[in-house]
Amino acid sequence: MVMAILTRQSRRKHLRVYNPPQQAAEVRYTPSATNSSAVPPVAVPPKPTADTILGKQYEDVRSVYSFGKELGRGQFGVTYLCTEIASGRQYACKSISKRKLVSKADREDIRREIQIMQHLSGQPNIVEFRGAYEDKSNVHVVMELCAGGELFDRIIAKGHYTERAAATICRAVVNVVNICHFMGVMHRDLKPENFLLATMEENAMLKATDFGLSVFIEEGKMYRDIVGSAYYVAPEVLRRSYGKEIDVWSAGVILYILLSGVPPFWAEIEKGIFDAILHEEIDFESQPWPSISESAKDLVRKMLTRDPKKRLTSAQVLQHQWLREGGEASDKPIDSAVLSRMKQFRAMNKLKKMALKVIASNLNEEEIKGLKQMFMNMDTDNSGTITYEELKAGLAKLGSKLSEAEVKQLMEAADVDGNGSIDYVEFITATMHRHKLERDEHLFKAFQYFDKDNSGFITRDELESALIEHEMGDTSTIREIISEVDTDNDGRINYEEFCAMMRGGMQQPMRLK
């Protein structure tokens, strides 16, 4: 009942932000018919611009902020560094193209995200919302600039790591969950990429930055649309009947990765990941788990309990003896190889996607018949790329009943280079059956692509050069992956090692000995 009240109150509260701003109203003077003096002025409030998303008049965000460099690019828009003209303070501005918000659901998603950001703003570990603006072409969301970078990047750069450090990070993540749930919000997409550090300082605060899939909790409602990211999704999401408990599961997956460097459930394809989430036992046997404290493992188990009714609540997690400030988390360094595994986990998918893309670009017409026509049918403007809108429309024509969120996830998975559209090779890579892509002749062509000098080996320089050319990873990360693939330790990757990397799972080559 408390949640329902909070939700209703928060919705009423949010709607105020979209009222017409308190600016000078138009003043109309009506001359008197019998008197030369004017009657008192009648204020006529400005009318909201027709067909707005935010329900208020258009405003020029550039009259308040000056825009600088691009910080990132996503499916619906671009994030820029911006500076408040009056104060000189720097913020981030996400500019969302209205042209890409083609459906009523798209527009409602943006409204809801802004409402939730404003509702949660000012709370610890949550990015501060500054304001929302709308003009003819875009919706602009101005928020706190988190200049400290991604969570995992900071951990890896630091080079040493303890259970206590993992507990501090996990406490911040679970605190976000606790705040969201207390304030009537379910996040639905907790993952490390959605957390940034506020500054470059050593003890910078961790901030949750993305609420695009979040919803206001409706008491008694069971949610059914599949949302989230594969490694972090809770089993009840896959069963299409879930509530806010899913956020604790996702936080538990993050904790498992913080302690071991890899996710608890993995596979080469999404279906395999989902099967593991539903049925497999959590691995506490392989390294580094024997050296991790029993208290830490106890918390992971209780956060990753498959029955949501038996899973700890966010408030209970914060009270766990391992997680509490000054609690049982050890200050003894965790094996440094965990950092290496964490780095590989972040980059391995990019490496394999790159190789698969090379293979897809070399498939012959016979192997891709049907897929080429499907691509052309979806590419309605003949641009050579498929936009989100075209993908959604094309899937609908094929009889797909995927939700908006599921189509967005398909788009993100297929869009390897992250430019917001799917090119022909990306489409083939995503739709071709994996066993065809992994046939010997295709793997050999991919091997030859990297083996520029036809020496029969891929050197570190060759693979680094190819991956940097396609902006798929940084040099240090690539070196570590090559070291893992190079099982005979001769400093090069031969064809057998390359095939093993492509066909094998992520977990086995990344296990600590």
UniProtKB/Swiss-Prot annotation:
Binding-site list for Ca(2+) 2: 415, 417, 419, 421, 426
**UniProt keyword annotations, A-Z:** ATP-binding, Calcium, Kinase, Metal-binding, Nucleotide-binding, Phosphoprotein, Repeat, Serine/threonine-protein kinase, Transferase
Enzyme class per UniProt: transferase
| Reaction equation(s) it catalyzes | L-seryl-[protein] + ATP = O-phospho-L-seryl-[protein] + ADP + H(+); L-threonyl-[protein] + ATP = O-phospho-L-threonyl-[protein] + ADP + H(+)
Tell me which residues bind ATP. 71-79, 94
Record domain Protein kinase: where:
65-323
- PROSITE patterns attached here? EF_HAND_1 (PS00018), EF_HAND_2 (PS50222), PROTEIN_KINASE_ATP (PS00107), PROTEIN_KINASE_DOM (PS50011), PROTEIN_KINASE_ST (PS00108)
Residues annotated as binding Ca(2+) 3: 451, 453, 455, 462
What is the protein's known function? May play a role in signal transduction pathways that involve calcium as a second messenger.
Family indicated by similarity:
Belongs to the protein kinase superfamily. Ser/Thr protein kinase family. CDPK subfamily.
Protein name listed in UniProt? Calcium-dependent protein kinase 2
Organism field = Zea mays
Its taxonomic path starts at: Eukaryota, Viridiplantae, Streptophyta, Embryophyta, Tracheophyta
